Amino acid sequence: MNDTNLKKEFREDAIDRFENQIATYYYTLQQYPDSIVYIENICPKKGMPQYGIDFNDEVEIENQNLKSLTYEQILLFLKNTKKERKEKFIDFLKKRDITFKSELDYWIDKDVI
């Protein structure tokens, strides 16, 4: 697969970004050829105990489980939800009987730690 095809099959939209003295928080929605993934990313700031470890809290829906739900509908829902976004998104999916996977992952920057 060449670069042009990959770009056509991948989409990413920023939903929100928030920063305080502890960390920077990023909220994104990504579309892959076979799934849609909502990510809440937390990046602790320098001087914080978890500095150098990025946390990704993800909800993944395989395309075959979307039923009639579209990427654009999910994006609109997430952009209009301000607090407890992940929890409300999971409730939204459960009410529509949409199968999803939710997991917390992390990445360690060995150059920092």
Over which residues does each language-model region extend?
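Intrinsically disordered, low-complexity regions of eukaryotic proteins
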Residues: 5, 42, 56-59
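Amphipathic, interaction-prone secondary-structure segments
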Residues: 5-40
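Short, surface-exposed beta-strand-loop junctions and turns on beta-sheet-rich folds
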Residues: 44-47
